[in-house]
């Protein structure tokens, strides 16, 4: 009795799947997820420091508009 290797036959190979469209979709999803994560981090940072930045800007504007002209007049 001969085995399959002796006849140079084995289990037939399946066709390789077409992965181009799937890979492109995965990359698109990954890119969008990274954009969303970056945007959330930016929004969180702005929200966390918004009041401090507003206060610093307000004090700087008072210094430039009120205090400096009084010193130089």
Swiss-Prot record:
One of its GO terms (molecular function) is tetrahydromethanopterin S-methyltransferase activity. The keyword Isomerase does not apply. The chain crosses the membrane at residues 52-72. InterPro entries: MeTrfase_F, MeTrfase_F_su. Part of a complex that catalyzes the formation of methyl-coenzyme M and tetrahydromethanopterin from coenzyme M and methyl-tetrahydromethanopterin. This is an energy-conserving, sodium-ion translocating step. Belongs to the MtrF family. This is Tetrahydromethanopterin S-methyltransferase subunit F. The lineage of its organism: Archaea, Methanobacteriati, Methanobacteriota, Stenosarchaea group, Methanomicrobia. The gene is mtrF.
């Amino acid at each position: 009795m001969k085995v399959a290797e002796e006849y140079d036959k084995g289990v037939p190979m399946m066709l390789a799947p077409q992965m181009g469209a799937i890979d492109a979709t995965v990359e698109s999803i990954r890119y969008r997820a990274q954009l969303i994560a970056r945007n959330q981090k930016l929004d969180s940072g702005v929200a966390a420091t918004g009041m401090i930045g507003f206060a610093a800007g307000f004090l700087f504007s008072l210094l430039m508009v009120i205090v400096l002209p009084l010193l130089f007049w």
